[in-house]
Amino acid sequence: MAENDVDNELLDYEDDEVETAAGADGTEAPAKKDVKGSYVSIHSSGFRDFLLKPELLRAIVDCGFEHPSEVQHECIPQAILGMDVLCQAKSGMGKTAVFVLATLQQLEPVTGQVSVLVMCHTRELAFQISKEYERFSKYMPNVKVAVFFGGLSIKKDEEVLKKNCPHIVVGTPGRILALARNKSLNLKHIKHFILDECDKMLEQLDMRRDVQEIFRMTPHEKQVMMFSATLSKEIRPVCRKFMQDPMEIFVDDETKLTLHGLQQYYVKLKDNEKNRKLFDLLDVLEFNQVVIFVKSVQRCIALAQLLVEQNFPAIAIHRGMPQEERLSRYQQFKDFQRRILVATNLFGRGMDIERVNIAFNYDMPEDSDTYLHRVARAGRFGTKGLAITFVSDENDAKILNDVQDRFEVNISELPDEIDISSYIEQTR
């Protein structure tokens, strides 16, 4: 395992491994707007109403988007005018598209100048955001995008910046800071500064220091946008310090975990009964793709191996493997080459795999925030999904009660039979 490879970088800050950096999850923020239980709200107005560039509209049509979601409807009109934005919205509501479209709309590419900087807390999320930029800039051939994160050679990054300087840079704070300090990355022309899953970066003091140092290297006059699914009352003032009179949008209701179309159940069992129960459920449930969350790297490796031995097409992703391997496996799963993914919390936040319709908490998450991020992997984009949580001791039961109390949701015991139409889209 490439432990040193990972630990030498001030980057990965994964939830499941305390020794890299102390995990500090934010708490859900109070609502300013009630979404009335609709997960991806449909607005009659289309993207055309935002008066976007024709090249962007063509790419949006190619991606199959017809109507903006609630968060897009609220944010995009202000964001494309260059306003600072602080936005909290549930997972899967299309936050990424807000800043991708808003920055591409305003971008006037200048050769050799980086004008957009997007940072997030994990390499996988950085990789995914860079792919979104590529998707939406499909008809903007002059726009160059690059992604920089630790675990891969910094020399290659320096080479890219020197020979083929991007207009848009996506990355993790540790690597971005290293490139800025050694003068490879010039931040003097930044016009848009974006933090995705901002609470993750600003709650951890070492990462916050990196972000602050990078921020100070950018011009005073710029647009700042921050997004997250969880934004505690404590972290909001920290976010505001980076901004000038931001528009604040909270498209959420903290008291309800109404992930639209998501069925949630628990199973009481002993720890040594989990494998048998999991195999039985994978046999009887209909699924497109499944994500199974475990609490450690060792359990992740062992369970994936066991599933393969039982003829379940599983693949594992955890922070103990080299970066190239992780990205390659993520892409394999995304491309539907494997239907079952076993993962640590590394995969629990911000990852978009449209075909996932079942999420298992094989091991109970450590708190209600992590529960939200994990189960939101199923039933994203307003589709149906199923979340099943294994409860094996009193601590597990306590966390499940916390989830139910906090989100005012009733998670009932898994029945013997579940109506397939309740958790999978029926195609006729």
UniProtKB/Swiss-Prot annotation:
It is an enzyme of class 3 (hydrolase). Residues 261-422 form the Helicase C-terminal domain. Residues 76-249 form the Helicase ATP-binding domain. Transmembrane segments: none annotated. The modification N-acetylalanine is found at A2. The keyword Transport applies. The modification Phosphothreonine is found at T172. PROSITE patterns: HELICASE_ATP_BIND_1 (PS51192), HELICASE_CTER (PS51194), Q_MOTIF (PS51195). It is found in: Nucleus; Nucleus speckle; Cytoplasm. Pfam families: DEAD, Helicase_C. Belongs to the DEAD box helicase family. DECD subfamily. The helicase C-terminal domain mediates interaction with ALYREF/THOC4. Homodimer, and heterodimer with DDX39A. DDX39B interacts with the THO subcomplex to form the THO-DDX39B complex which multimerizes into a 28-subunit tetrameric assembly. Component of the transcription/export (TREX) complex at least composed of ALYREF/THOC4, DDX39B, SARNP/CIP29, CHTOP and the THO subcomplex; in the complex interacts with THOC2. THOC1-THOC2-THOC3-DDX39B subcomplex is sufficient for the interaction with export factor NXF1-NXT1. TREX seems to have a dynamic structure involving ATP-dependent remodeling. This is Spliceosome RNA helicase Ddx39b. It comes from Rattus norvegicus (Rat).
